[in-house]
Amino acid sequence: MPESRTVALVTLGCARNEVDSEELAGRLEADGWKLVDDAEEADVAVVNTCGFVEAAKKDSVDALLEANDLKGHGRTQAVVAVGCMAERYGKELADALPEADGVLGFDDYADISDRLQTILNGGIHAAHTPRDRRKLLPISPAERQEAGAAVALPGHGPTDLPEGVAPASGPRAPLRRRLDGSPVASVKLASGCDRRCSFCAIPSFRGSFISRRPSDVLNETRWLAEQGVKEIMLVSENNTSYGKDLGDIRLLESLLPNLAEVDGIERVRVSYLQPAEMRPGLIDVLTSTEKVAPYFDLSFQHSAPNVLRAMRRFGDTDRFLELLDTIRSKAPEAGVRSNFIVGFPGESEADLAELERFLNHARLDAIGVFGYSDEEGTEAATYGDKLDEDVVAERLARVSRLAEELVSQRADERVGATVRVLVESVDPAGEGDGVRGRAEHQAPETDGQVLLTSGAGLSVGRMVDAKVVGTEGVDLVAEPLLGSPEWSEEAGR
């Protein structure tokens, strides 16, 4: 019997890319490929790249070069680029980076197995010429669902399989194959974006906004629960737009309670919310539905009106603070995170001071700060009044220092509070990191963790109530409560 073909998936970038990698993994495994964790053990190393900002693109190139270094002295025979940077640059990337044996776009995903086999056999796959993927779907959202059947939409599940391939209880295989044993998994709610932020190129390569049907999201969530997942995080470029192409802009409000009722799911988290599209009903559902985390990942980006207008965005400091007041009037301990761009073209000292005023009053749990840099193909790249790089760097350092101080202060405010923690890692020796998890106000990777002072009887995937007794920067230190049903049940075994 011939030795099985092996493939490793290396994922960079956001949670949406993680979903796409698991779809690719499912397709490859269904076609006989053996998935391995270490690229050194793979015939083909597939690097799922990020093309968001310059630093992310550099990381993607570095990962491709690192994988290429494995060729010639191990099992690895080919390195293939997929993902956003591959889609965005296509042939340009292939010409600039001959170390990659193939550059595959989203349209290649349905045939990923054949593409990799061709490359592994020494064949050449001609990289695509990039196109604006917004033009693949109708301008009218109401017409997109029908047209979407003919468009590659990574993470939406395959549309190229015959009916009846998989049981009705779950998504049609091969939808995805989990690449780790984490009790947390992202679920793609939609793809693309209809907003026209002047600094962002994502819509050009991810396309116009298109929702997944609620039944598909529910089926995938049930399947994930069967795999041991306890928390799902809904991801897309803009979750607040969910349902607008399905005839119901409030569809998220009705979907969330249904997701929370899926057997085995203990927490539902929503990410990527646009402040300008927040509505009272959505705030109500996010703050009052059992098992739905009162968590708000709000994309503020700035708070000075002049800068926001130049960004083609809406709002100001006072309106954003009013939104936060509304949220906290319903859920005082709600978690809030956001990202900000400093050094945007035309940003004055007064604009920066206005952003700092907002940050000082907002009491955010997590803050990401980025220095502006031109992204080709964006409106902002054509702007005059650009700031010198050293000015951008100074402002980035200044606001980053403030952000670090503020999120530490916000963590201190939670001392004495009771938090519900999903256990994500347990050191069996009781040393090192001990038992770590996340509370409702903490999303994976970005928002800090909770270190539990006692781990007796706790295991990965358990929920436990704990009292916050201290902090380590943005992280919390908490003591499990003896009365927590899950802790007591597990500890007594």
Swiss-Prot record:
Q: Which UniProt keywords apply?
A: 4Fe-4S, Cytoplasm, Iron, Iron-sulfur, Metal-binding, S-adenosyl-L-methionine, Transferase
Report the principal subcellular site. Answer: cytoplasm
Protein name, entry field? Ribosomal protein uS12 methylthiotransferase RimO
The protein's annotated catalytic reaction(s) are: L-aspartate(89)-[ribosomal protein uS12]-hydrogen + (sulfur carrier)-SH + AH2 + 2 S-adenosyl-L-methionine = 3-methylsulfanyl-L-aspartate(89)-[ribosomal protein uS12]-hydrogen + (sulfur carrier)-H + 5'-deoxyadenosine + L-methionine + A + S-adenosyl-L-homocysteine + 2 H(+)
**NCBIfam families in the record:** 30S ribosomal protein S12 methylthiotransferase RimO (TIGR01125), MiaB/RimO family radical SAM methylthiotransferase (TIGR00089)
Stored SMART domains: Elp3
Q: What biological function has been recorded for the protein in this entry?
A: Catalyzes the methylthiolation of an aspartic acid residue of ribosomal protein uS12.
This chain is encoded by the gene named rimO
State the GO CC annotations: cytosol
Q: What is its EC number?
A: 2.8.4.4
Phylogenetic placement of the source organism: Bacteria, Bacillati, Actinomycetota, Actinomycetes, Kitasatosporales
Give start and end of each TRAM domain.
412-482
The compartments listed are: Cytoplasm
What does this protein need as cofactor? [4Fe-4S] cluster
**Protein family (similarity comment):** Belongs to the methylthiotransferase family. RimO subfamily.
Provide the MTTase N-terminal domain boundaries.
5-121
Q: Which GO terms describe its biological process?
A: tRNA modification
Q: Which residues form the Radical SAM core domain?
A: 179-410
- One Pfam family, please name it: Radical_SAM
Give the span(s) annotated as Disordered. Answer: 153-177
The residues that the entry says bind [4Fe-4S] cluster 2 are C193, C197, C200
Q: What enzyme class is recorded for this protein?
A: transferase
Cofactor info, note text = Binds 2 [4Fe-4S] clusters. One cluster is coordinated with 3 cysteines and an exchangeable S-adenosyl-L-methionine.
> One MF term from GO for this chain?
protein methylthiotransferase activity
Please tell me where [4Fe-4S] cluster 1 binds in this chain: C14, C50, C84
